[in-house]
């Protein structure tokens, strides 16, 4: 299993989903599911390719006077680090179907800005089916896309 990087707010929904992935990976005999959490405060830098798991904030509605609103500011800060951005290989988004058309929209934003595949989306903490589909999908993704550079870095 390749590395995951994720952000979870104080609601812990995304964190719980990542914990479910880890338990299911162990139960399958696949070993640990390495995951690094982007902190609420402070900085981290990664050193291995990863898939990002991110929640969508606020129904995507921007804060008055500020641009954005879909992607948590901690994730924006993390991805603004050139090294971290160079190692992202895909994105998985969490959200709430109450957001309507903006459900899991953070994944769409990050996929477009970082030029990486939008691999999956799930609601809130995800279901057992989501966990299985993500684990299966990540296995296939890393077989087909082993540690490649994102498209925007291939031509530099």
UniProtKB/Swiss-Prot annotation:
Q: Which domain of life is it from?
A: Bacteria
Q: Which GO terms describe its molecular function?
A: FMN binding
* UniProt GO BP: protein modification process
Q: SUPFAM superfamilies from the entry?
A: Flavoproteins
Give the similarity note: Belongs to the NrdI family.
Give the protein's biological function. Probably involved in ribonucleotide reductase function.
Record protein name field: Protein NrdI
Species annotation:
Mycobacteroides abscessus (strain ATCC 19977 / DSM 44196 / CCUG 20993 / CIP 104536 / JCM 13569 / NCTC 13031 / TMC 1543 / L948) (Mycobacterium abscessus)
Q: What is the lineage of its organism?
A: Bacteria, Bacillati, Actinomycetota, Actinomycetes, Mycobacteriales
């Amino acid at each position: 299993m390749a590395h995951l990087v994720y952000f979870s707010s104080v609601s812990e929904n995304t964190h719980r989903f990542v914990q479910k992935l880890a338990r299911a990976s162990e139960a399958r005999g696949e070993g640990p599911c390495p995951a690094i959490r982007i902190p609420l405060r402070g900085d981290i830098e990664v050193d291995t390719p990863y898939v990002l798991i991110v929640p969508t904030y606020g129904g995507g509605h921007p804060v008055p006077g500020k641009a954005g609103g879909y992607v948590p500011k901690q994730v924006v800060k993390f991805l603004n680090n050139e090294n971290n951005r160079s190692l992202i290989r895909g994105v998985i988004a969490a959200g709430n179907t109450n957001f309507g058309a903006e459900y899991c929209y953070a994944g769409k934003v990050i996929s477009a800005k970082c030029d990486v595949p939008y691999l999956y989306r799930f609601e809130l903490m995800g279901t057992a089916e989501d966990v299985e589909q993500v684990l299966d999908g990540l296995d296939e993704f890393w077989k087909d896309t082993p540690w490649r550079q994102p498209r925007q870095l291939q031509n530099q």
